[in-house]
Curated annotation (Swiss-Prot):
Residues 345-355, 907-920 have a biased composition (Basic and acidic residues). Residues 632-763 are annotated as: Domain B. The modification Phosphoserine is found at residues 30, 242, 560, 600, 604, 616, 772, 780, 787, 799, 803, 847. This is Retinoblastoma-associated protein. One of its GO terms (cellular component) is cyclin/CDK positive transcription elongation factor complex. It comes from Rattus norvegicus. The hypophosphorylated form interacts with and sequesters the E2F1 transcription factor, thereby inhibiting E2F1 transcription. Interacts with heterodimeric E2F/DP transcription factor complexes containing TFDP1 and either E2F1, E2F3, E2F4 or E2F5, or TFDP2 and E2F4. Interacts (when hyperphosphorylated and hypophosphorylated) with PKP3; the interaction inhibits RB1 interaction with and repression of the transcription factor E2F1, potentially via sequestering RB1 to the cytoplasm. The unphosphorylated form interacts with EID1, ARID3B, KDM5A, SUV39H1, MJD2A/JHDM3A and THOC1. A motif (Bipartite nuclear localization signal) lies at residues 852-868. Changing residue 772 to A: Decreased association with HDAC1. InterPro entries: Cyclin-like_dom, Cyclin-like_sf, RB_A, RB_B, RB_C, RB_fam, RB_N. The gene is Rb1.
Length: 920
């Protein structure tokens, strides 16, 4: 408990010191009810500042006692108080905050606490990171930080925008009572009230910014023309162009309110200037903002709402929420100031070393501008798309044995109703139309990607009957969910950040809305990325993070279909039911399609013969399906690929952790990986309702223990917390048994060690188990090497396309960007006729004849001194630019063949010389 105020009594014998508290689990939450509230005697301990701080914040006794116990634990940590004296007061404030949140007793606002300990938002949260807190506190801090970030970005945007709209020194004749600063203040507080009323989700950036544009439109119409800059002055002139008098000014708001609903010229100008979708902003304007303004009932003064009246209205909201007083942004209060280097405020581009190029530097984007740009990019793709199936899709539907069109349309309609209701429930009931707009975009993307997938499958299999795939409900729900996730992420900040710091609509929200299992959603991600070429780099990263979330925990939930699939595969294939360990060192194949993933199990690749068909029109879906099932045992493509990706993700994280903790014992990494991989393959039940990283940390601790390496679990947890994806709940709240959770140390002792004790002890013996191969780690599953691959024994080089997309939306393919594209072969694209192959064969034959004649004449072609590249104008000095494409190709073939012939002759001569020497 905190110290009591000192008494004025005679000196007495000091009480005996209290017994030392038991050592707490560093990774374990402390439940509020479990902490002992032992009343200690603090008469001789003078901490008047702590007492004064609690009194100033009106902290109740039980909260003060909890805060003091928290302070005792915090102050015992080595180095926590190093730096400066002020840090002690700040830590007291943090301990009071922690106690108040844990006990659900918050007698003060967050801003009042900041003012009392004189610290900024970021300083407060940085200090809080040094303390192990409960999940409850973590969630409260996360909510506050996200709200602050959004408010900070929006105020910065409003301040800059008002500077572009209003004149700081207007012409004479304007009342001195009205100025740009006053308009900024009333605009900001009106926006705060509107945001609290309309947007239920505090950290939504896009809807909030659209609402801000509505507020700006409202006050532009209320402002006198002499205060406005162009083009806003011209847009607002028909409304506020008449001269003002004090009496007329008093009735101005009522007069303009009648014109608000019909006049949208100002808001159209605002949308154009900020590159916003005008239809979306108008929807917010008519459905949300105008009803809010009508119900506000604020008093007008000089044509503008009274600042004092607005501020008093906001005061009530602020005191009720107990968090940030956003009015302080207007004063640039130090408690709300960001750090000098703040990644949220602007996405800064690196400074160029050449000062002459300073003028050409890219202007850094604010968070609002960044999100608006990503939305604009999505609109470019989807504006020309339809929210109904295209003629090509309808043709595919008609070619199916069972036409899926009716079911697809009904599914889209039914899911739409569910989506809009869930969206409105999360964001605000007034935003149901916004949800409808976003769902419409998702449906457009859904049909677009579906058509691309079917075209790709048609080219690959030469069939048009996809009845089985197109009548698969899970496939459609997964594809629709992925399209909606792309749209939702585009409109939120979660794409730019870690998923855990996103909004309430962040992944896996869409899975809950559609009642879709994460493992089924995972199956479509890779195919979605491959066929939709216009996805931005950031969106591909976002989908990759979604895939990681699924692989690390979401796919391992107890109701996941993954466990049934593992069991079926195990029963069918015996001990090698999962991905073979020997295949881990092989590169990950990236040629899986949606049909492979959703129509598996298919025949095991090891027992499957490979056939190549060119221009085969007689191939049907039935024949293809029967070919898949002619041999047994069956193997699930989706399960095999899932385990390969899980192994690679697991090893990558383990490798990072080992580099930080076991750099002096590099040989242990392979042993830890073997135990880790063995657990995932043979003890996969341990993953049920748990996290991949929990098994990783337990594997590391177990091997270090048996190898007599002094590595405490606390050290492992501390290093793990520094990983970019880490969450405290991963090691604080681990499933022990049904509905019972505890720390990761308890899980290791009572569950992990009990299950794997025999296996772990084997690594201490003289004959340890065979080590598992290290997985092949590509840079990314969705990035392909651009280096050509030479096929052994031939003069053929295979190089991937520079980009996977085909002709779409007027964008050129990589082959179109190559001057000699007519002699390039793109495997997987529509080849047209066989003329191309015949032309290549003819070139090869002609080059062979040229080589023979050259060899007979004794004048082989002279090899080039340097390589020629497929770029127009390269090597102009030797005249190659003026050669026709066929002649260049022949010359290259001749040069390559000549070089190989000379190398073979040289090798043969060397062999003969060696044999002659041996004979001698």
């Amino acid at each position: 408990m905190p110290p009591k105020a000192p008494r004025r009594t005679a000196a007495a014998e000091p009480p005996p010191p209290p017994p030392p508290p038991p050592e707490d689990d560093p990774a374990q939450d402390s439940d509020p009810e479990e902490l002992p509230l032992i009343r200690l005697e603090f008469e001789k301990i003078e901490e008047p500042e702590f007492i004064a701080l609690c009194q100033k914040l009106k902290v109740p006794d039980h909260v003060r006692e909890r805060a003091w116990l928290t302070w005792e634990k915090v102050s015992s940590v080595d180095g926590i108080l190093e730096g400066y004296i002020q840090k002690k007061k700040e830590l007291w404030g943090i301990c009071i905050f922690i106690a108040a949140v844990d006990l659900d007793e918050m007698p003060f606002t967050f801003t009042e606490l900041q003012k009392s300990i004189e610290t900024s938002v970021y300083k407060f949260f940085d200090l809080l990171k040094e303390i192990d807190t409960s999940t409850k506190v973590d969630n409260a801090v996360s909510r506050l930080l996200k709200k602050y970030n959004v408010l900070c970005a929006l105020y910065s945007k409003l301040e800059r925008t008002c500077g572009l709209i209003y004149l700081t020194q207007p012409s004479s004749g304007l009342s001195t009572e009205i100025n740009s600063m006053l308009v900024l203040k009333v605009s900001w507080i009106t926006f705060l009230l509107a945001k609290g009323e309309v947007v239920q989700m505090e950290d939504d950036l896009v809807i909030s910014f659209q609402l801000m544009l509505c507020v700006l439109d409202y006050f532009i119409k209320l402002s006198p023309p002499a205060l406005l800059r162009e083009p806003y002055k011209t847009a607002a002139t028909p409304i506020n162009g008449s001269p003002r008098t004090p009496r007329r000014g008093q009735n101005r708001s009522a007069r303009i309110a009648k014109q608000l609903e019909s006049d949208t010229r100002t808001i159209e100008v605002l949308c154009k200037e900020h590159e916003c979708n005008v239809d979306e902003v108008k929807n917010v304007y008519f459905k949300n903002f105008i009803p809010f303004i009508s119900s506000l009932g604020i008093v007008s003064s000089n044509g503008l709402p009274e600042l004092e009246s607005l501020s008093k209205r906001y005061e009530e909201v602020y005191l009720k929420s107990k968090d940030l007083d956003a009015r302080l942004f207007l004063d640039h209060d130090k408690t709300l100031q960001t750090d000098t280097i703040d990644s949220f405020e602007t996405e800064r581009t690196p400074r160029k070393s050449n000062p002459d190029e300073e003028a050409n530097m890219v202007t850094p984007h604010t968070p609002v501008r960044t999100v608006m740009n990503t939305i604009q990019q999505l609109m470019v793709i989807l504006n020309s798309a339809s929210d109904q199936p295209s003629e090509n899709l309808i043709s595919y539907f008609s070619n199916c044995t069972v036409n899926p069109k009716e079911n697809i349309l009904k599914r889209v309609k039914d899911v739409g109703h569910i989506f809009k209701e869930k969206f409105a429930s999360a964001v605000g009931q007034g935003c149901i139309d916004i949800g409808a707009q976003r769902y419409k975009l998702g449906v457009r993307l859904y049909y677009r990607v579906m058509e691309s997938m079917l075209k790709s499958e048609e080219e690959r299999l030469s069939i048009q009957n996809f009845s089985k795939l197109l009548n698969d409900n899970i496939f459609h729900m997964s594809l629709l969910a992925c399209a909606l996730e792309v749209v939702m992420a585009t409109y939120s900040r979660s794409m730019l950040q870690n998923l855990d710091s996103g909004t309430d609509l962040s992944f896996p929200w869409i899975l809950n809305v559609l009642n879709l299992k994460a493992f089924d959603f995972y199956k479509v991600i890779e195919s979605f990325i491959k066929v939709e070429a216009n996805l931005t780099r950031e969106m591909i990263k976002h989908l990759e993070r979604c895939e990681h979330r699924i692989m690390e925990s979401l796919a391992w939930l107890s109701d996941s279909p993954l466990f049934d699939l593992i069991k079926q595969s195990k029963d069918g294939e015996g001990p090698d039911h999962l991905e073979s360990a020997c295949s881990l060192s092989l590169p990950l194949q990236s040629n899986h399609t949606a049909a492979d993933m959703y129509l598996s199990p298919i025949r095991s690749p090891k027992k499957r013969t490979s056939t190549t068909r060119v221009n085969s029109a007689a191939n049907t879906e039935t024949q293809a399906a029967s070919a898949f099932h002619t041999q047994k045992p069956l193997k699930s493509t989706s399960l095999s690929l899932f385990y390969k990706k899980v192994y690679r993700l697991a090893y990558l994280r383990l490798n990072t952790l080992c580099a930080r903790l076991l750099s002096d014992h590099p040989e242990l990494e392979h042993i830890i990986w073997t135990l880790f991989q063995h657990t995932l393959e043979n003890e996969y039940e341990l993953m049920k309702d748990r996290h991949l990283d929990q098994i990783m940390m337990c594997s590391m601790y177990g091997i270090c223990k048996v190898k007599n390496i002094d590595l405490k679990f606390k050290i492992i947890v501390t290093a793990y917390k520094d990983l970019p994806h880490a969450a405290q709940e991963t090691f604080k709240r681990v499933l022990i048994r049904e509905e019972e959770f505890d720390s990761i140390i308890v899980f290791y002792n009572s569950v992990f060690m009990q299950r794997l004790k025999t296996n772990i002890l084997q690594y201490a013996s003289t004959r340890p188990p065979t080590l598992s191969p290290i997985p092949h780690i590509p840079r990314s599953p969705y990035k392909f090497s651009s280096s050509p691959l030479r096929i052994p024994g031939g003069n053929i080089y295979i190089s991937p396309l520079k980009s996977p997309y085909k002709i779409s939306e007027g964008l050129p393919t990589p082959t179109k960007m190559t001057p000699r594209s007519r002699i390039l072969v793109s495997i997987g694209e529509s080849f047209g006729t066989s003329e191309k192959f015949q032309k290549i064969n003819q070139m090869v034959c002609n080059s062979d004849r040229v080589l023979k004649r050259s060899a007979e004449g004794g004048n082989p072609p002279k090899p080039l001194k340097k390589l020629r590249f497929d770029i127009e104008g390269s090597d102009e000095a030797d005249g190659s630019k003026h050669l026709p494409a066929e002649s260049k190709f022949q010359q290259k073939l001749a040069e390559m063949t000549s070089t190989r012939t000379r190398m073979q002759k040289q090798k043969l001569n060397d062999s003969m010389e060696i044999s002659n020497k041996e004979e001698k």
